[in-house]
Amino acid sequence: MLDTKEKFSHLTVSLHWLVGVTIIALLAVGIYMEENEADALYLIHKSIGVLIFIAVLWRVIWRVRNGWPKPAGNYKKVERVLSKITHWILIIGTVLMPVSGMLMSGAGGHGFGIFGLELVAMNPDPLNPEEMIPLNQSLAELGHILHGAGGNLMILAILLHILGAFKHHLVDKDGTLRRMLGADIGR
């Protein structure tokens, strides 16, 4: 089933919440890891990041195939533009965050995988195995910059998205949030 103005498909709703909740959790864990040097969380963070990338690609393909959802109501032009910008940041960000993380980790010599299944091997220094030798320092730095800046931009876009959802639900009372929870707002 494709999305309609009144109802989103189960796939759209499921992918929205799976990707949204997971990205929020990964952002929170990422901030915690950075601020607390919680090295034990890197394996989990990277593994879930790689796995969610699969769902993100599925979601992007589904969105392209299905098209953008029609608004549940009539809104001012500024609201429509802000909504489009926010949604594009979220879509691009959900692709950019896993890609930049894999680039940072892989090119930085730290490798990554899925819960012990190595996808890109670590590159330890033979003289000091605790230290990693970057495979490409420039790409690792680019990944690091994109991951950090992308994370900050994603947090802002997520907050705008959540505020918009509450505005639709509490002020406009237009069914947008109920539709994303799976309801048919045409009934």
Residue ranges and their predicted role:
Residues 1-187:
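Membrane-embedded alpha-helical bundles that constitute the cytochrome b-like, heme-associated redox core
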